[in-house]
Amino acid sequence: MTQGEYSVQTFRDSVKFYVPRVEGYLETVREMAAKYSGMSMIEFDGYFEGRFEPVKYTRIEIHTNDVDEAQMMEAANRLRLSLKQESLAFEFNNKLILIAEKKSH
């Protein structure tokens, strides 16, 4: 096979959102699919926030070249608020980041 018979694309950034399957999550998936041309989804049971009963989660993974960490933190916080969650985790280039509401004392 010669080099002219195929093309190669490299994506610098990998973002993985851990989204609980609650009311509104499908709309989030649709918005991400429209914004980013390629993504993958994996469903799993999550045991977070000290809970014994599992919660259904979807990991949405996006590969792109046009985002930075601060943009993703803002996007994750908007997502957390729209899904009415106390916290939301995401990975940016293999670094796990937890976005949570501030606790008032």
Please give the residue ranges for each predicted region.
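Positively charged, small/polar-rich N-terminal and surface patches that mediate targeting and assembly
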Residues: 2-105
